[in-house]
Amino acid sequence: MSARIIDGKVISAELRARVAAEVTRIKTDHGITPGLAVVLVGADPASEVYVRSKHKQTQEAGMASFEHRLPADVPQAELLALIAKLNADPTVHGILVQLPLPKGLDSNAVIDAIDPAKDVDGLNPVNAGRLASGLFALTPCTPLGCIIMAKQVHASLEGMNAIVVGRSNLVGKPLVQLLLNENATVTIAHSRSRDLPALCRQADLVFAAVGKPEMIRGDWIKPGATVIDVGINRTPSPDGGKDKLVGDVAFAEAKEVAGAITPVPGGVGLMTVACLLVNTVRAASAIHGLPKPAV
């Protein structure tokens, strides 16, 4: 058996098209243009690529895109002052500070300073608490993308056994909350969990977000399970050429056992920016007291 490939390119394109349609509707019906402000501190090459992608996709969706670039040695107070300015700006509905920040800056203080109503990364403790309480919240983009991809295979996740391997604030913990809100039965595990292979073999849904290249092997997967691989790891090429990207799952092994699986690259990573656009539209609608958009 060879697993169905859950194609992030196709799914993210469909999601961006739905976002663009909602943006057009909000503009036409209410005269509001959703706006996303991205703050980049320093010049990390990977962050530069990601910010360019966000800017391009935001504009393609018909939204306003604002970029704010600060030097790596910017004082904390200056960064917080910029966030306060964006919090008060009525044309900005979403604020994202590109992480990680350079050394010397307090990421937690920066995240705490973002207005929860504009926190499109979903990392402010207010949004984390609302999510845990089952209330409306802006949700971290990668976990949201994981749920959307799982629902491409299963119309409902209710009653399914799910395992989340990884416990980060960015992916693992919010993903657990989203799965609980879908009425799945959830196990959260990590690299130090006892007998992790046995835990994985019990799961109908495996979400790998541990940050270790190909840690989850094919014989850890229950036959027919759905595997969502969040990992993006750069590893040396065996032939000495360009480094290659691999996930947290041994893809070649797992696809012979799983019922459906996301590839790396071409899977969850493409959903992250698409879900950022979703959060920006949701934030704009909530700020202006509009009904929740159809995305």
Swiss-Prot record:
GO terms for biological process: L-histidine biosynthetic process; methionine biosynthetic process; purine nucleotide biosynthetic process; tetrahydrofolate interconversion. SUPFAM superfamilies: Aminoacid dehydrogenase-like, N-terminal domain, NAD(P)-binding Rossmann-fold domains. InterPro entries: Aminoacid_DH-like_N_sf (IPR046346), NAD(P)-bd_dom_sf (IPR036291), THF_DH/CycHdrlase (IPR000672), THF_DH/CycHdrlase_cat_dom (IPR020630), THF_DH/CycHdrlase_CS (IPR020867), THF_DH/CycHdrlase_NAD-bd_dom (IPR020631). One of its GO terms (cellular component) is cytosol. Keywords: Amino-acid biosynthesis, Histidine biosynthesis, Hydrolase, Methionine biosynthesis, Multifunctional enzyme, NADP, One-carbon metabolism, Oxidoreductase, Purine biosynthesis. Gene3D superfamilies: Leucine Dehydrogenase, chain A, domain 1, NAD(P)-binding Rossmann-like Domain. It catalyses: (6R)-5,10-methylene-5,6,7,8-tetrahydrofolate + NADP(+) = (6R)-5,10-methenyltetrahydrofolate + NADPH; (6R)-5,10-methenyltetrahydrofolate + H2O = (6R)-10-formyltetrahydrofolate + H(+). NADP(+) binds at G166, R167, S168, S191, I232. Pathway: One-carbon metabolism; tetrahydrofolate interconversion. Belongs to the tetrahydrofolate dehydrogenase/cyclohydrolase family. NCBIfam families: PRK14186.1, PRK14188.1. This is Bifunctional protein FolD.
